[in-house]
Regions:
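Accessory nucleic-acid engagement/destabilization modules that flank
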Residues: 1-28
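SAM-dependent methyltransferase catalytic region
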Residues: 29-283
């Protein structure tokens, strides 16, 4: 539909490559390097917006709202290289040593800004995961990048929680039970657990007040570890709300660490005990 096409522009076609007739040797120079930098860059934009985007994010300030180390880790280009593609600048021809001027302007500013704005609006509209009338999922609009940034579809998350409940009847009715996702991708699995706990008759009986019940769930029942900084930001913003609407300052239990690496090193159990131990003991 038109919304999907518009959002897709933010992730797939927001980058406009300059197509000009040039000499063959020039095509083997700066243009090839530019295209190599741009390859896949557009697909990272929705992830950045999920993690760091706010109203007012534009092409002009895009490089300032994202930490430089995260920018390079996700896109494989530096912030300075992005600015070079956007603004242009001087560069030295590798073969001749001649200093040349690259004009930049590889991004259509109007399309970029409009697409970013529409994605932020869509993100806000789909942010309330407690609203079961929602038929769309914001992660349907976020293209996968690296292997550890492939997001679990919502229907799979629901099936996982259904299976868990089937194998352990009544697991969501005891306020002392704890649940963990030690390798979060989007935070969606945790949100499905939060919803089950929040609507549980057992939890409602223990915490009749909606806010107190949600605080208890977030502070004492759900735990998560995210492997990279951008995934941590995406997951925690999705779980707690992009403006902390869900969390509201509660003492949640989400950490940034690579659980896979910790498991390989044989230190995962010790890490979990160190960062979550006190809370797990209270549950």
């Amino acid at each position: 539909d038109s919304r999907e096409e518009l959002v897709q522009r933010a992730g797939e076609t927001v980058v406009r490559e300059v197509e000009t007739a040039k000499k063959e040797d020039e095509k083997q120079g700066i243009e090839d390097k530019v295209r190599a930098h741009l390859r896949g860059f557009s697909r990272t934009i929705p992830s950045f917006l999920m993690a760091y985007g706010e109203e007012g994010t534009t092409l002009a300030n895009f490089d300032t709202v994202i930490p430089a180390d995260v920018f390079q880790d996700v896109t494989s280009i530096t912030v300075d290289e992005f600015r070079f593609l956007r603004d242009g600048g001087d560069y030295t021809d590798g073969e001749t040593g001649e200093v040349k001027r690259f004009v930049g302007h590889l991004f259509d500013e109007v399309v970029f800004n409009d697409s970013v704005s529409e994605f932020i609006k869509l993100r806000e509209r789909l942010a309330n995961y407690f609203d079961e009338s929602q038929t769309e999922d914001i992660f349907d609009y976020v293209p996968p990048q690296k292997t550890n940034q492939i997001f679990t579809p919502r229907n799979v998350g629901v099936q996982m929680v259904d299976l868990f409940e089937k194998e352990t009847p009544g697991c969501f009715d005891d306020p002392s039970h704890t649940f963990a996702d030690l390798y979060m991708k989007s935070g969606l699995y945790i949100t499905e657990i939060i919803k089950r706990l929040y609507r549980s008759e057992g939890t409602k009986a223990a915490f009749p007040d909606d806010r107190e019940r949600l605080d208890h769930i977030l502070e004492h029942q759900v735990f998560g570890i995210a492997p990279t900084k951008i995934i941590y930001e995406i997951a925690t913003h999705f779980i707690l709300g992009f403006h902390d609407e869900v969390g509201q300052g509660c003492d949640s239990n989400f950490e940034l660490a690579d659980a896979a690496e910790l498991a390989k090193e044989g230190t995962l159990e010790a890490y979990v005990e160190r960062v979550f131990g006190p809370k797990l003991g209270e549950a």
